[in-house]
Amino acid sequence: GNAASWGGGVAALGSTFNMYGGVISDNMVSASAGGVLLSDKSVMNMSGNAQISNNIAPTKWTTSGGGVYIFASTDGEVGNCLYMSDNAKISGNTATQGGAVYVRKNGQVTMSGNAQISNNTATENGGGVYVENSTFKIAGGAPRVCDNLCQDVQNNVYLATGNAIRISKLSTFAGKIGVSTQDTPTESNLVTVAAVAVEAGGGGHLTEEDLDHICSDKENLYPVLVGGE
């Protein structure tokens, strides 16, 4: 493995990084982005059997993105993007926030196929993915975000205030996504955790079948369909 301040394995700056296979593993950083840093409107495509595993952004202070850190875009446009398809996998990574992935302002994470984010750890929030003012999208297939932990408790996709999982209606979704939210839902104050993705040729409504694949990380909470079909 390697050691760096940011991007222990790869730092993509204003570029496209295609990872069709192979492994980025056992890297450590002193700041954030243990495995991969995406900045300056970069795109990363993980496909085939590509893996990002066992990278560390130290937890002595606030660090983010043990596997991948998706930097903020400040011009209001979609910025840095991570696309996971086929059997791509991010596992065994550690950070303070976003054990596997931390995606900031105007970033995007899209999962499809049998992509998987599992067995990552955060000490604060987002054992799997920390989503802050960004898009986390499911584009069909059977992707899974599960068995990620924060302080020994399930904490998979952590949605900061105002964020929701976006589900494409152009193809069938049959995976499993665990969800935690910054805002605490109550009977009188529902919190949106999923919505239809905005895309060309898309539209429609979420269904009960869609919600069968979204589950709360807290045992006493469960998603309900509002205004769908």
For the regions a protein language model found, what residue spans apply to each?
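Intrinsically disordered, low-complexity regions of eukaryotic proteins
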Residues: M28, S42, E77-G79, L149, ...
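Extracellular beta-strand/beta-solenoid scaffold signature
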Residues: N2-A11, M28-S39, A57-E77, T94-R104, ...
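The right-handed parallel beta-helix/beta-solenoid scaffold, focusing on the short coil/turn
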Residues: G8, S15, G22, G34, ...
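Extracellular/surface-exposed low-complexity segments
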Residues: A139-E229
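A structural detector for beta-sheet-dominated domains
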Residues: L13, Y20, S39, S47, ...
